């Protein structure tokens, strides 16, 4: 892709998300979503091949459907309230439709089917944008209208997302699909706490973005897309491969790594609100995620694939530069659990 075109598209993507973040008018919010969607489709098709075209088409159809439902909900809300203000949500039908539209954009269950397919069909860099930056706008809108949301609907979608995010990743060997199912599960955790403590959802989002960005940068450094190619990177960069495995365990929520912090705090907050059964089920379902991360770590770190090449230098891999931000990102996404008591200063 031409660098100038990529800069223009990136600026449009950021502008669309920024409009959603700062807008208090429903039409401007919808316009920001459309700007963002139309600009990211060429980015998804950056590697011009049938797979990326199919992924971009699936993404477009899903997002266009969600935008249509969102506009319908906005019109219904306008008919009942007579206002375009985001915080003025008086109609339960409009609130439910907006929730469905935004969860479809996020890729929560039962609207999750597009996430693994689209992520697998695009490049690692496009997948990083898809699973991090593209979550900001819908979640910011949910954050603004959390008082009007249907708690029971969100809880049902949250449990489904955590369950499908765990089950879906069990038989996967493609790392991009594993990251996609991980994203579905993490979104489920964020939505579960949205109506109780939206600030905790924001903290969960920040930690999720840090961990996912670290993981994708490490995979980009090694040009790794499958478990087989991951196991073959020991010859090239054993330290980086170790960091990949630690980051995977952090994504799974294994203590004492950073990924355990949001799960711990969400379970604590739900318990404070006299909800015992829900966090219990969520904790059990989270073990599915942790299981396939542990299995991936075991198969990569503790077993050796048969090879006919005794050469220790992996000459077939491209050499890539270590990004300056990689080290602090990895440290933040794995080692910040001891700093958790400092979060009490924010409350």
Swiss-Prot record:
GO terms for cellular component: mitochondrial inner membrane
Stretches assigned to coiled coil: none
Membrane association type: Multi-pass membrane protein
Function: Core subunit of the mitochondrial membrane respiratory chain NADH dehydrogenase (Complex I) which catalyzes electron transfer from NADH through the respiratory chain, using ubiquinone as an electron acceptor. Essential for the catalytic activity and assembly of complex I.
Single GO BP term: mitochondrial electron transport, NADH to ubiquinone
Domain of life (superkingdom): Eukaryota
Top-tier EC class: translocase
Enzyme Commission number, as recorded: 7.1.1.2
Bilayer-spanning residue ranges: 3-23, 25-45, 59-79, 96-116, 127-147, 149-169, 178-198, 201-221, 239-259, 274-294, 322-342
The family this protein is said to belong to: Belongs to the complex I subunit 2 family.
GO molecular function, one term: NADH dehydrogenase (ubiquinone) activity
Key words, A-Z: Electron transport, Membrane, Mitochondrion, Mitochondrion inner membrane, NAD, Respiratory chain, Translocase, Transmembrane, Transmembrane helix, Transport, Ubiquinone
Places the protein is found: Mitochondrion inner membrane
Reactions catalysed according to its record: a ubiquinone + NADH + 5 H(+)(in) = a ubiquinol + NAD(+) + 4 H(+)(out)
S-S bridge residues: none
Subunit structure: Core subunit of respiratory chain NADH dehydrogenase (Complex I) which is composed of 45 different subunits. Interacts with TMEM242.
Protein's name according to its UniProt entry: NADH-ubiquinone oxidoreductase chain 2
